[in-house]
Amino acid sequence: MRIVDINERLAISGQPNTDEFINFARRGYRSIINLRPDGEEPNQPGNDAEQAAARRAGLAYNFVPVIGTSITEADIQAFQRAIATTEGSVLVHCKSGTRALMLYALSEVIDGRMKRDEVEALGHAHGFDLGRAVTWLERQAIQTPRVSGFFDPRTSSIQYVVTDQTTKRCAIIDPVLDFDEKSGATATTNADAILAHVEQQGLTVEWILDTHPHADHFSAAQYLKQRTGAPTAIGTHVTEVQRLWREIYNWPTLSANGSQWDHLFADGDVFNVGSIKGRVMFSPGHTLASVTYVIGDTAFVHDTIFMPDAGTARADFPGGSARALWSSIQTILSLPDETRLFTGHDYQPSGRHPRWESTVGEQKKANPHLAGVDETTFVALREARDKTLPMPKLILHALQVNVLGGRLPEPETNGRRYLKFPLNALEGAAW
């Protein structure tokens, strides 16, 4: 196995045997990064075996599985984090070393330490063909809009800043207001990270959009509106969710007319992010009010389709329907195959890094809930799976905030705010 030194901290290689890990430690490496998805080849060791071998050798270990033809910025960020969080020398491997060098080159270009026209020469200097990296950079340069994802590990949610690079105007989608259910504390860490990005990039926020009233996190829409002055929006069917939860919460004073948002989008409505046209698709199933935002060559599909290795979202919340979810997914999959899809959650199957971008074509080919599956099979699969899932731990906390557009309850006479929980209102207890 050939090891290629790229710089004083980074070396790359093809697939090593796990019995070589102890020798890597003796040679001074401190960390192994495995870029190979499990199952690429019948004889590869796999994530579990490599992790165990690294532990025995006293090496740090990171699993960042990527496919050379579908690398995303989330993959590049995970690669960068894995290197940055390790002291000392790092050995990165894939099958041949090409993906490892490709991720390094893309990282260097994105961070401004390397010019695009230097990528191929880097590959040739080390005996690799980086043509795919060049193609990736060329494709990224013409993608519209530019999408930046912000992963919240507490709720496994992804928040987005969607930017028109020409006008420097942007939309924020599904922002998270931090909440700790043990202490009852709220914070704006996630939202402030988004604001810092907006300021750093010199952007003007044109929209603050929620895809649906979330059951697993509080929306930061109101906080961001206060900070930016941008209007908030959601799908018009939010009124049905408000009426449903008004009854569950026994909340007769809740105005179930959607007035908590500045704009309600109907199916087919159009809007702009700078000079880029956006379109709203009604996508019920996960909730009664879910919408997909199609902006340029992207679609923000919230809790309908997860990453191809993670299947689809649940449909057993009050007002949910597996059959409606199937129909919504089929509408999404009718978009062009090259459409970039951005999901609302990633639960990191097999312990991999967070990912959130795929394409329509990738979903059709690789998602086990969709590839070769018909409606009847999907509904049976989805309903059976949902029966095994407990309710989200924040559903009763979050909905009373999110049906108000992200507003916290008003303070009571002692100046404190309170949440209200109905008992025995929902099925799905995990005893």
Swiss-Prot record:
It is an enzyme of class 3 (hydrolase). The keyword Metal-binding applies. Coiled coil: none annotated. GO terms for biological process: glutathione metabolic process; hydrogen sulfide metabolic process. SUPFAM superfamilies: (Phosphotyrosine protein) phosphatases II (SSF52799), Metallo-hydrolase/oxidoreductase (SSF56281). Its cofactor is Zn(2+). Zn(2+) binds at H212, H214, H286. GO terms for molecular function: hydrolase activity; metal ion binding; sulfur dioxygenase activity. Its EC number is 3.-.-.-. Pfam families: BLH_phosphatase, Lactamase_B. The keyword tRNA-binding does not apply. SMART domains: Lactamase_B. Substrate binds at D309. Keywords: Hydrolase, Metal-binding, Zinc. Induction: Repressed by BigR. Part of an operon that comprises bigR, XF_0764, XF_0765 and XF_0766. Belongs to the metallo-beta-lactamase superfamily. Could play a role in cell adherence or biofilm development. This is Beta-lactamase hydrolase-like protein. It comes from Xylella fastidiosa (strain 9a5c). The gene is blh.
